[in-house]
């Protein structure tokens, strides 16, 4: 008993402890858990499911992404999932209020690809299509335009443009597609064809899908010969209203300033140089140090299960590195969708307006002029040092100075865009939908120009100022209506049919007006009071207006995609299209395509590879598309009063004169492109690594071109004809993957390669040819481009350099390989050869995104390999004679100083332009601020450097010349390649509420 009495207190204590643990455990077992499920943008994921692992207990997230679970064990694990996101297991560890962030599923085969009038999962695609999502487009490219952001992202797509805020980008997909008709891909924005990519803000874009081959683009008919770029803008998701502000602040640093001769070096070096006694760095005079640009973007989105609204406002103020080259943009967009009657009817509206105010006094031409200008001419007036020099000390003979010509003018352009579409979608039956849209695309340009009375051109023409005012408006209207049918059938739903049948109408009309006058009594009032100038009463003022014939297209189209067991796929499309541009005999064309795919990885004999081979698919496609990109009204005779008229000064009566405007060709017909494409798609290691390979060949027949016509019998000196055929072919490789993927660190990398070559198969009659633009005076050396039957595209047509004679004059080889002087009868086309290659043998781009916890880092590299550039700066600013007194670039002069004679268009001035470029480096940090402020969900700070560095052995100014079109590879004196090369430094902040 004593022993028992001694142990009672101990037993009691043990029982109390056990009861305490039991009570605590009991309370924990019945605790409530609440939480919020968000995507990586901080937006609620409506309908996400949460299950307690090992139980049947679960909940779904509401419109705010919130959920509540009752009676959950403190050590339970939650299974969280949502469609399109990677499932997660979350250990509670006693927490009762949690925030869960899901990331999008990396299963690339389930990604949705937008195609003509519909969409497909990537695994079902049988054509060559490259897709870019919003995150991939924007990654690491702060402060960029859409065109700049696309650079290096898509194999086979080449983009040309400059750093000028007023420059536009030109696009070319898979090489040259025509000798004169449209060579740029068709831009389709939210289903509206013919869009202008300058209209869009990068933040508004949801995805970009590039249809590369004819089988993908044939359903767009006549305008898809050069490929199609489909751009889809953002829709709001159901859930709370989300507001995002993005501010970007950019400055530029000139990184590769040409080393020009100083005034002293100039007078000692350049033949017949005139020394005006001053030393002016004209390159510095026309450029700015660290111009400042800013952009502010505000987006608001939200909605319910039935209504969603996305809207945005944007303001941008950009200063160019060249004086007189500035731009301000204002943009607004609203996308709204409303579903009613149990989702059987869906109504949508998308509307965007944008305005750009452009100060376009300076630009590409300004830089070239400044680089060539005599450095001994003073910047400021000799007699009035506070004013710009206009015509003193040699400036008059040189046409005024580059600076005074900018400062003494007003040159403003205003671009206005309006893009709107209204859609109606009706679910007629399970899988059967009727959809229609009405679209408007209106663009207007207003140009206002005033030349000050103090400007050299006014002084030269003895007039007190010159003014002009112009308008140019284009309105495109289109309507679409189509039935779409989607059905899965069979015992295991192994058959899938996706079909479209529709009709389309599109028309375009253009109107222009311009007027000019000169010699105003009050300097500066001219643009806004044109009638006040004296040129009107003297009969020297000008006025013109124009209304184009309406360009109409009517189309009927159909497409069917079939797949069996996600293993065998086939697709076919056809479009019957009529164009008002052609005569009655050739007005209608039929464009069609077929393609097929085989997912070998799903075959039973591939079972042993499933642990590492996620997917392997072979694609084969063939399609025919057309091209009608020629002026309207050329198949019928027209009258014009371009000859002007005459004024009866005695009576004050003005008489118009009319005459034939063109040589009509009623037999003109469509260009036709036939394209064959073979492709291979693969993904490895549970989609950690993916890629694709494409090989293609294109044949373009019935080439449209404006050729010379003899007078007489023709009334005009040119006529449009179908002149021949051409071919291009090439290959593309795209590889990407999540190289590293851990809880805290991910590295995503993509690499693409492309190659293209082409030739003219036939061009007109025997011996006919087309020459490119001639090089400018002085010297008039001719054009380095000639197209003729059998000629390769991208080759230069020049003389062969054979050294210099004892006097330093260039010698060439004639057609018999004899060394002859480059003079007289030796300068003829029979002594020229095709040489070099202005199309890169290989274009490579490597894009990387690394994320460590809240930090992100981006690196983008791009290279053009084994291509040639012919340098106008080397010919015009590297020789001491025949330059018209141009200033020289030192390194080019050092290379060429053995040449004492005039320039000759020969292969001496061609050199390898191979380069590797760091397109962008970025670093960012994202801070989850919701824990401190319930309204501010997320803050992101980032710094981006664009156009960081270029590595090349090219000795000219810039090897990154235009490689689009029929005259590629030329570094021009006034071209985009001479616009200052700058490093763009952008600091950005993004706030999500």
Regions found by a protein language model. Give the residues of each.
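Short, small/polar-rich motifs associated with maturation and membrane association
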Residues: 1-334, 338-354, 419-420, 670, ...
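Extracellular/lumenal ectodomain signal focusing on beta-strand-rich modules
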Residues: 47, 71, 111, 131, ...
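C-terminal extracellular loops and terminal segments
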Residues: 147-151, 720-727, 769-796, 829-830, ...
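Extracellular/periplasmic, surface-exposed regions of secreted and cell-surface proteins
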Residues: 164, 184, 267, 271, ...
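Flexible glycine-rich, low-complexity coil/linker segments exposed to the extracellular/periplasmic environment
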Residues: 256-284, 375-406, 525-551, 643-663, ...
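Short Gly/aromatic-enriched secondary-structure transition segments
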Residues: 259-262, 451-453, 515-518, 766-767, ...
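Glycine-rich, aromatic-lined ligand/substrate-binding cores of catalytic
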Residues: 838-870
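C-terminal beta-barrel architecture of Gram-negative outer-membrane proteins
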Residues: 857-918
